[in-house]
Amino acid sequence: MYAEDKFREIYNREPETSFCPYRVCPLGAHIDHQFGPILGFALDYGVHMAYGVKNNGIVELMSMNFPKRVQFHVASVPETKEGDWGDYLRGATKALSEKYKLTKGLCGVIRGALPSGGISSSAAVTICFMKALAKVNDIELSDSEYIYLAKKAENEYVGVSSGKLDQSCETLCRKDNILYMDSKDDTYRNIPASSNIKPFKIGIFFSGLERNLASSAYNNRVDECKAAAFALYSYAVTDRRGDYELKDGLKFQDMRLRNIPEEIFKEFGVRLPTSWQKRCNHFYSEMHRVEKGVGCWEKGDIVSFGRLINESGMSSIVNYECGSPWLIKLYDILSKLDGVYGTRFSGAGFKGCCMALIDPDKADEIKEIVEREYLKEFPTLKGKYKAYICSTSTGVGKAEGDRF
């Protein structure tokens, strides 16, 4: 049953609709929160919402994916999170209400088309709901507002130290393009697929294990990167201040690895704890992979582009030290298969899924082999492991009407 049908069943009227696509990031993983550049696609799967206005200001929403109906008033959002999926709705309402006057609520049904974990379902839920809440209150949000407010909701209310990657891809992407965005200054461009590029699809291979980003090691990795940046900054200021162009008076909370030239890491990185050195190695090498990836994409060289994705995946394992036995097994299987141009963890990379760029003619064969080999290793996940073949899509901010 779809969200529209469920809404009609519950409320006995026709709904309005809202949609936000999921996203994948082939290159630029784990560096957006350090102000690095990213490359991303929006997918033709996403979060759908059927809703109707409530003039009394009450928000009443049920999910077809998670238990518990969420209910609150737009003027009295709980100050602290409750630890359920409704936190994203509460956070979105709070962020929106700090900028605009909200008088109307809504009732509705929300449904994610794919399992959660690794495709930015949390940002998609946040944006999909925010779009609907803004509409019933006659608020028209710009692309930058979608990105800023959805990020604010996750950072300040839900408690996830995410960057702008998820919200940017889900808002700004265009079909048959790859989004290049520099998280340092928010400049971006959609780069069309070259006429020379081989046909490809985006495979999403779910481990069968969902993850809670806020309670994972994600925030710890962000803090390690910031700590490494602050330490490198301190070493450079103390020992070689005149040799580098560095801003004065940077505070820890404002520190990012993008503030630190790679030359400083090469000179002083040996002083860092081993784990921090690894985080830096991932950041700087991923920056280079993104720039190389742009060149490959513009030339239509998907084979070389795929190799960079594989390298990114390995760096996530070795240097960023994310992953799990399940995701690493999926990565190992996919990276060796004929017809897979490149693969890596998607999202935080602790449970979730792997994404892969694949040859469409070999999609069925790839799905069959991955399922067989993965379930041979983890037989208890039969029925939970899932695979989907997706195409690129247009982000919510660029869409011409709702796609439901």
Regions found by a protein language model. Name each.
Residues 1-37, 71-76, 81-197, 336-337, ...:
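Gly/Ser-rich oxyanion-binding loop with an adjacent helix/lid
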